[in-house]
């Protein structure tokens, strides 16, 4: 998957395909937001992912981040849902959640 060919549908599909691996890190909920979710990305855009863990640990966070960066060969901005500032509540509304 080249950087230029990525779009929201391909990202969501790839996350669904790797759901078994993603669940290994105690992920309860995961979604795509930001430029890719709006299909307004450019070739240097990072991928913005929001996540909720059943068991939130540093290892689960870092291992998920490394997995996602390996999957997409692109920088990932991984945000834990409950850490969002109230001013950024719109992020939850624009997020495209993935069925795990």
Regions of interest found by a model, annotated:
Residues 48-51:
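Short beta-strand->loop micro-motif that forms the acidic, two-metal-ion catalytic signature
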Residues 1-29, 37-43, 54-100:
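Catalytic core of pol beta-like nucleotidyltransferases
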Residues 32:
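Conserved histidines in hydrophobic membrane contexts and catalytic metal-binding motifs
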């Amino acid at each position: 998957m080249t950087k230029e060919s990525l779009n929201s549908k391909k990202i969501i599909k790839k996350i669904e395909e790797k759901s078994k691996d993603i669940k290994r890190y105690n992920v309860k909920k995961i979604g795509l937001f930001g430029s890719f979710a709006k299909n307004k990305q450019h070739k240097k855009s990072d991928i913005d992912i929001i996540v909720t863990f059943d068991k939130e640990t540093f290892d689960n966070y870092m291992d998920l981040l490394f997995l996602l960066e390996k999957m997409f060969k692109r920088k990932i901005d991984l945000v834990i849902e409950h850490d969002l500032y109230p001013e950024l509540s719109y992020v939850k509304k624009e997020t495209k959640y993935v069925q795990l």
